[in-house]
């Protein structure tokens, strides 16, 4: 095997593993993708408290105090919450501080509330009339209704409590009183259908954010994904999760089951009511960024408004195989950001620091390659001499390597050892929530979590799934080619047609693979390529 082929195979083996890693990551993300109403409007005083006695009397006379559905909008420091008097449900929950591509607040509970509400409680179907609303204060909101069975009227209340500290958490309570002689239609439990679409994105947004929706559950100290017919007793929490946001639900002593209905996986919370005179169940709902800065505060009761502890919401953030490498990398990025508040520059500086740290490995690999190249004349002589005897050729080659003290794989190992660092950086830059919406170069790279854009088509190109003209992928391709040429030290004139195809085809292949990747990832890749070119020139000068 001549020197150029060996170097090419080493480089392409590394690139193949990188491509395989990204392909598996993309497939895994895609895999996870997995009544009564009134259209009349109502105008009434939302701040007026309801009269329980008057309401109860009106129910007994089958008269509706409120016979028209009403949306009630509540604003907190972090949410725009919309409730409906139809079943007293939360129908929209928008994050004020996190905008989507259309520059609108991200909606975490974007559902068809009349047909598929966010928290669909079994009792809702027993209520014939609309719920009455009462604002306790800015953080506490109550909905009340009554339902009848066997001539008796039962009080049914839903309470919503928001955090006073602008935490991404709310408490939801289900209260049913007067069950001493009522067995809830001979059932021993009631169900809540948990449904959260977490922002029904436009086709552009789905492609840009590489978005997926997965049903997740945490039990036995493990993060699992929901599947059909799965039933779990007393998990820590269940939830719906995307790349950057999630809605998680926690309750003591709950049972959860997953069922596929019309091809859609749904989750159900089963609540026991055996021997209960009254029902008073509390659910804690996290609805916000998929970011440990906001999730981990619920593991210590002194850190959050509701006094929760050991909820383990932070375990919803998937940990990659390279997590231990990613942690110090993110810390270094944060240090750079604190000095210069620009995440794009932080990525560049982090990349340079990493490349400097692994320079000894790079230098060792290049030196091994240089030592091997000195043997080319002797290797060619052996190849000519034993061209009809491959077995003898291998024996003589081995003897030559041993006599000269050269390891033919010496240039491969340093490259392979660097791959975990690349994978860790790739995973960090591709998934870090802090990069969502982070501006690097205004007017060009406005969001490091999606691809850059200089022109938007308004439609998707069929064969390549392109929606925009992007500049970074072209820069990446040319710098990748330059990096490969400099690193390989190959005379292009001596390459065969097949080798030239592989030589130029690999950067082109990665151009298509990475075209729609987050711009933050491409900035890392381009910085690596440029640093490699400069580094290889320095090494060549040093060795010469």
From Swiss-Prot:
Instruction: Give the UniProt entry's GO cellular component terms.
Output: plasma membrane
Which UniProt keywords are present, listed alphabetically? Answer: Cell inner membrane, Cell membrane, Chaperone, Membrane, Protein transport, Transmembrane, Transmembrane helix, Transport
Could you tell me the Gene Ontology terms of the biological process aspect for this record? protein insertion into membrane; protein transport
Please give, as recorded in its UniProt entry, the membrane topology of this protein: Multi-pass membrane protein
Entry-linked InterPro entries: Membr_insert_YidC (IPR019998), YidC/ALB3/OXA1/COX18 (IPR001708), YidC/Oxa/ALB_C (IPR028055), YidC_ALB_C (IPR047196), YidC_periplasmic_sf (IPR038221)
Q: Does the keyword Chaperone apply?
A: yes
What does the UniProt entry say about where the protein is found?
Cell inner membrane
State the Pfam families in the record: 60KD_IMP
List the transmembrane segments: 13-33, 321-341, 343-363, 409-429, 461-481, 506-526
Tell me a Gene Ontology molecular-function term this record carries.
membrane insertase activity
* Role this protein plays: Required for the insertion and/or proper folding and/or complex formation of integral membrane proteins into the membrane. Involved in integration of membrane proteins that insert both dependently and independently of the Sec translocase complex, as well as at least some lipoproteins. Aids folding of multispanning membrane proteins.
Return the similarity comment: Belongs to the OXA1/ALB3/YidC family. Type 1 subfamily.
Q: How does it assemble?
A: Interacts with the Sec translocase complex via SecD. Specifically interacts with transmembrane segments of nascent integral membrane proteins during membrane integration.
Q: What protein name applies here?
A: Membrane protein insertase YidC
């Amino acid at each position: 095997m001549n020197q150029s082929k060996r170097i090419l195979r080493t480089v392409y083996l590394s690139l193949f593993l990188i491509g395989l890693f990204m392909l598996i990551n993309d497939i895994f993300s895609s895999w996870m993708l997995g009544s009564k109403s009134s259209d009349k409007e109502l105008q009434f005083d939302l701040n007026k408290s309801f009269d329980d006695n008057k309401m109860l009397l009106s129910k007994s006379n089958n008269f509706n105090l409120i016979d028209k559905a009403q949306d009630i909008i509540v604003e907190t420091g972090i949410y725009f919450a919309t409730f409906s008097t139809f079943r007293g449900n939360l129908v929209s929950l928008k994050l004020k501080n996190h905008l989507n591509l259309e520059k609108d607040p991200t909606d975490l509970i974007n559902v068809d509330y009349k047909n598929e509400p966010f928290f669909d409680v079994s009792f809702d179907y027993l209520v014939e009339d609309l719920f009455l609303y009462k604002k306790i204060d800015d953080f506490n909101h109550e909905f009340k209704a009554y339902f009848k069975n066997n001539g008796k009227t039962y009080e049914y209340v839903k309470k919503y409590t928001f955090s006073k500290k602008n935490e991404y958490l709310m408490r939801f309570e289900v209260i049913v009183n007067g069950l001493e002689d009522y067995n809830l239609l001979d059932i021993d439990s009631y169900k809540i259908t948990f449904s959260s679409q977490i922002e029904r994105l436009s086709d552009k947004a789905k492609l840009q954010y590489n978005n997926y929706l997965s049903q997740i559950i945490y039990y036995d100290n493990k993060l699992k994904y929901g599947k059909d017919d799965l039933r779990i007793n007393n998990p820590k929490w269940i939830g719906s999760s995307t790349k950057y946001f999630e809605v998680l639900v926690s309750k003591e002593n709950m049972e959860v089951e997953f069922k596929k209905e019309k091809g859609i996986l749904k989750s159900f919370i089963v609540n026991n009511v055996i021997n209960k005179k009254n029902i008073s169940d509390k659910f804690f709902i996290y609805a916000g960024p998929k970011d440990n800065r906001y999730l981990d505060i619920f593991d210590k009761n002194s850190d959050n408004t509701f006094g929760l502890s050991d909820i383990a919401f932070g375990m919803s953030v998937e940990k990659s195989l390279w997590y231990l490498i990613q942690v110090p990398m993110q810390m270094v990025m944060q240090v750079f950001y604190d000095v210069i508040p620009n995440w794009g520059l932080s990525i560049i500086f982090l990349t340079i620091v990493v490349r400097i740290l692994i320079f000894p490995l790079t230098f060792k690999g290049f030196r091994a390659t240089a030592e091997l190249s000195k043997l080319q004349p002797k290797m060619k002589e052996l190849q000519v001499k034993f061209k009809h005897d491959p077995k003898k050729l291998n024996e003589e080659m081995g003897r030559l390597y041993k006599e000269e003290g050269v390891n033919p794989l010496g240039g491969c190992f340093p490259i392979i050892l660097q791959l975990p660092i690349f994978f860790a950086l790739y995973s960090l830059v591709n998934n870090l929530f802090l990069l969502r919406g982070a501006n690097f170069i205004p007017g060009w790279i406005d969001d490091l979590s999606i691809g850059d854009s200089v022109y938007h088509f308004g439609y998707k190109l069929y064969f390549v799934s392109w929606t925009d003209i992007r500049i970074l992928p072209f820069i990446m391709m040319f710098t990748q080619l330059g990096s490969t040429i400099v690193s390989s030290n190959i005379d292009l004139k001596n390459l065969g047609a097949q080798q030239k195809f592989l030589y130029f085809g690999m950067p082109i292949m990665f151009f298509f693979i990475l075209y729609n990747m987050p711009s933050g990832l491409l900035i890392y890749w381009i910085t690596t390529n440029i640093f490699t070119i400069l580094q290889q020139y320095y090494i060549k000068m040093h060795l010469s």
